Amino acid sequence: MDDFKGRHFTGGVILWAVRWYCRYGISYRDLEEMLAERGIDVDHTTIYRWVQRYALEMEKRLRWFWRRGFDLSWRLDETYVKVRGRWAYLYRAVDKRGDTIDFYLSPTRSAKAAKRFLGKALRGLKDWEKPTKLNTDKAPSYGAAIAELKREGKLAPETEHRQVKYLNNVLEADHGKLKILIKPVRGFKSMPTAYATIKGFEAMRALRKGQARPWCLQPGIMGEVRLVERAFGIGPSALTETLTMLTQHFTNAA
């Protein structure tokens, strides 16, 4: 299936624009000018539609690659995001190293929202991949959510719930880096458009932290570029790319 069928631009150009927008914290108009400098004439409203269509798909396809190898000590917190002039709550989790675990956008801050967030973060994890320690602020919603997940068997009974403020410093710092990406938006139009865009931001943040490095066949940014392209079936397969790199290596060594 061609994900870019009917588009006026190639998949490579579209992913280039979406990846840049989600990675570098620039406005749609600035990105329009940057692409124009490279001979690509596209309106900023078209770039917006690309981000809405492909950012969440990019996060979905890359999720398997970056959601691996977490430390079992997690940090949970929420930050604020403006949607239609009102504050929404972006729940986020990282491990003690700062690697992104998961996120969830909610219009409310409640035990129900906290449970949905934690349930999403735990979904698909084997028992041995689930956290042994959860650090949160003192909001009672987290305690209620954790207790309910334990009763449902989704968290082990011995999972420790801590409320140590300084342990969340790594997550607070990560909030700040995400806010740099969100700032040019100047407020989202709706919850669906906000969530779609944030999914792209979070996916690019995870790649930038090196969470998918084992699956990047080339070093640096080009490894990430090719991983994104392969996720959409663009360019050579991983096997072909590996064989090409090996051939070049032995040719240069000869």
Where in the sequence are the language-model features?
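Short conserved beta-strand segments at catalytic cores or DNA/RNA-binding microdomains
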Residues: R84-T100, S110, L118-L122
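Short, solvent-exposed beta-strand edge segments and adjacent coil->beta transition regions
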Residues: T100-I101, P131
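Charged, often Cys/His-bearing segments associated with DNA-binding zinc-finger transcription factors
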Residues: M1-K82, R116-A254
